[in-house]
């Protein structure tokens, strides 16, 4: 069962820290208090809070490898979790490291590593706030160009009605066939 690998990984991490951790699963998170937007929320599969480390674990069921490094979905989940903390008077988080992990069991069928992760410092994570805020606010501009592409359109709910994607498809098909005279 695919979920067995995910559970084994989580249990392994819990044992690594002698059980001194908190696990939360299927949690709705939003970075709104840090990014200034309330439309960037999502469901974090698993949060693991261990001494000094916040780990975001995302389960993927596909065969296409997903990288943990530089993964905006995981970064937004991490910012969402951090946004949910009520900071003490000294304003520090209980974490100094953010670990972002992808568990993708089906990759083992392709002899690929099914668990990948990356770690960054809390400061590096917090430095990403401005980039996310700027990118999100840029989408509010009614003149913002639609920029179709394989990565950004893959799971977009507007894919079927996007005029820019349709135009790109027409142009691509036009290049494949010679002009008939």
Regions found by a protein language model. Name each.
Residues 50, 65-102:
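Metal-dependent nuclease catalytic cores in nucleic-acid-processing enzymes
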Residues 1-54, 97-99, 111:
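Metal-dependent nuclease catalytic cores that hydrolyze phosphodiester bonds in DNA/RNA
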Residues 59-60:
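Activation of the activation-loop gatekeeper triad in protein kinase-fold domains
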Residues 113-121:
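Short beta-alpha connecting loops at secondary-structure transitions
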Residues 81, 108, 120-124:
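Internal, well-ordered alpha/beta segment that forms a basic, Gly-enriched binding/recognition surface
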Residues 41, 72-76, 127:
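A general alpha-helical scaffold signature found inside nucleotide-binding enzyme cores
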Residues 103-114:
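Short, conserved secondary-structure transition motifs
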Residues 123-181:
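Accessory terminal regions of nucleic-acid processing enzymes
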């Amino acid at each position: 069962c695919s979920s067995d690998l995910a559970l084994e990984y989580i249990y392994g991490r819990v044992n690594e820290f002698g059980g001194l951790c908190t696990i939360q699963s299927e949690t709705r998170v939003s970075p709104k208090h840090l990014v200034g937007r309330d439309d960037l929320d999502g469901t974090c599969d698993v949060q693991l809070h261990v001494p000094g480390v916040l780990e975001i674990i995302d389960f993927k069921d596909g065969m296409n490898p997903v990288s943990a490094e530089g993964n905006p979905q995981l970064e937004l989940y991490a910012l969402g979790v951090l946004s949910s903390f009520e900071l003490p008077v000294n304003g520090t988080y209980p974490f100094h490291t953010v670990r972002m992990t992808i568990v993708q069991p089906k990759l083992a069928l392709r002899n690929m590593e099914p668990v990948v992760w990356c770690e960054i410092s809390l400061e590096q994570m917090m430095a990403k706030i401005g980039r996310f805020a700027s990118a999100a606010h840029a989408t509010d501009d009614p003149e913002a160009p639609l920029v179709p592409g394989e990565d950004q359109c893959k799971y977009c709910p507007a894919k079927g009605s996007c005029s820019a994607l349709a135009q790109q498809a027409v142009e691509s098909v036009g290049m494949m066939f010679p002009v008939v005279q």
